[in-house]
Amino acid sequence: LLGMLPVALSALSALSKL
């Protein structure tokens, strides 16, 4: 699960740019 945290953060940052 810990390995997916940075992935989720990067996805959220990508959505923020939209």
Swiss-Prot record:
Keyword Secreted: yes
Secreted in keyword set: yes
Record-listed Leucine amide modification sites: 18
Keywords assigned by UniProt, alphabetized: Amidation, Amphibian defense peptide, Antimicrobial, Immunity, Innate immunity, Secreted
GO cellular component: extracellular region
Compartment list: Secreted
GO biological process per UniProt: innate immune response
Cystines in this chain: none
Tissues expressing the protein: Expressed by the skin glands.
Family: Belongs to the frog skin active peptide (FSAP) family. Medusin subfamily.
Function per UniProt: Antimicrobial peptide with very low activity against Leishmania species (L.amazonensis and L.infantum). Shows low cytotoxicity against mammalian cells in models of peritoneal macrophages.
Name of the protein this chain belongs to: Medusin-N1
